[in-house]
């Protein structure tokens, strides 16, 4: 028996030794797609769970996984002004460290969200955690505070009375911080070692919850930021505006994705497929059926998926926009769908995951219920799916 247990631990440890990092919101390139094989199909609270750990407080941010560590944020207190950053061992779920901050910005927000709404981003040196209060902290892998900034302290006019949720990302070795709000709106690149501004570009004052998308085109890193009525690409090195297009109807909640040079921009009127090169802009197609609301679209194996707040998954051809199928799932989705290993994962707000076969015809493979509120988008790494609920961090996968 001891030899069997040792072998099982070795197998799980080996999977993490070769695990694909999932270092930011929706994975390495922000598309929500894993390249790993052997991803789970069926699970419940009592079966198919590699480990689970109680969380100290609520959060709607996503977990991120880098170098075998799982990082997550939470917020607590009567005013939601106690901010938490935690690290767990990805193999065992053991808590590695837990750090707390006092919020410096306002904590007003919609009841559905909280101050732990932006997803952290990680690299080999540690994790960068931003909160809806405008507090931003960088920790080493061992939990040592490297630097801290109060963005509200630096820019006092920042305000959003329903909460902020845009997440930081990494581009060209810089920490990209989106800060669209009703006050001083901007997007900035920070030095990862010091937290100091490298460039800062002012943007139109607007409430916006979109996370930037990073892609490389013609040797240049583009940081693509959507907002109400406009999508803009900035040069990652300098912040120079590369291109911008108005009247595309982009969302101020769901984030864009891309595949093979095509940008899929979600909006209140559906999803638009855009081709942007060398300062020129072309709309390829627009589909009003692909309207995910708060959930970002997924493009996988040449199919675009949108999970709606009405409990319907719509699928369309990624090249033409032609509708392929729609399928009703239980509940409604706030989290964005993920994909990998030929499967598409749809997460509803009550903790039920619908697993679909990635195909041009609808086929439900499983429905898996954890029975806890799930608003944050999960992460995939080491053959496992990391799901954060309002109470628990689950690692779903074979033991």
Residue spans of the language-model regions?
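Bacterial N-terminal signal peptides
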Residues: 5-15
């Amino acid at each position: 028996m001891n030899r069997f247990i040792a072998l099982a631990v070795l197998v799980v440890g080996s999977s993490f030794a070769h695990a694909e990092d999932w270092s930011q919101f929706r994975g390495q390139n922000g598309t929500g797609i894993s390249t790993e094989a052997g991803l789970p199909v069926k699970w419940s609270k009592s079966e198919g769970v590699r480990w689970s750990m109680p969380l100290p407080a609520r959060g709607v941010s996503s977990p991120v996984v880098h170098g075998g560590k799982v990082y997550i944020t939470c917020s607590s207190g009567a005013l939601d002004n106690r901010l938490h950053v935690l690290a767990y061992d990805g193999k065992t779920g053991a808590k590695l460290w837990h750090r707390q901050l006092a919020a410096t910005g306002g904590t007003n927000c919609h009841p559905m969200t909280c101050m732990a709404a932006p997803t952290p981003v990680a690299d080999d040196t540690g994790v960068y955690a931003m909160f809806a209060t405008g507090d931003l902290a960088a920790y080493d892998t061992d939990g040592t505070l490297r630097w801290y900034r109060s963005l509200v302290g630096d820019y006092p006019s920042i305000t959003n009375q329903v909460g902020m949720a845009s997440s930081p990302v990494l581009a060209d070795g810089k920490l990209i911080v989106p800060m669209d709000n009703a006050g001083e709106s901007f997007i900035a690149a920070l030095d990862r070692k010091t937290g100091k501004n490298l460039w800062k570009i002012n943007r139109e004052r607007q409430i916006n919850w979109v996370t930037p998308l990073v892609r490389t085109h013609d040797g240049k890193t583009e940081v693509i930021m959507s907002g109400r009525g406009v999508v803009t690409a900035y040069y990652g090195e300098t912040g120079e505006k590369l291109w911008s297009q108005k009247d595309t109807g982009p969302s101020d909640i769901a984030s864009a994705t891309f595949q093979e040079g095509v940008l899929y921009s979600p909006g209140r009127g559906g999803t638009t497929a855009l081709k942007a090169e060398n300062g020129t802009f072309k709309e390829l197609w627009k589909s009003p059926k692909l309207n995910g609301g708060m959930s970002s679209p997924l493009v996988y194996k040449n199919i675009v998926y949108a999970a709606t707040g009405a409990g319907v998954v719509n699928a369309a051809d990624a090249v033409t926009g032609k509708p392929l199928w729609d399928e009703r799932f239980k509940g409604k989705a706030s989290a964005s769908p993920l994909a990998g290993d030929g499967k598409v994962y749809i997460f509803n707000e009550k903790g039920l995951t619908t697993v679909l076969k990635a195909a041009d015809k609808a086929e439900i493979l499983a429905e898996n219920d954890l029975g806890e509120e799930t608003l944050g988008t999960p992460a995939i790494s080491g053959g496992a799916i990391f799901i954060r609920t309002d109470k628990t961090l689950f690692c779903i996968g074979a033991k």
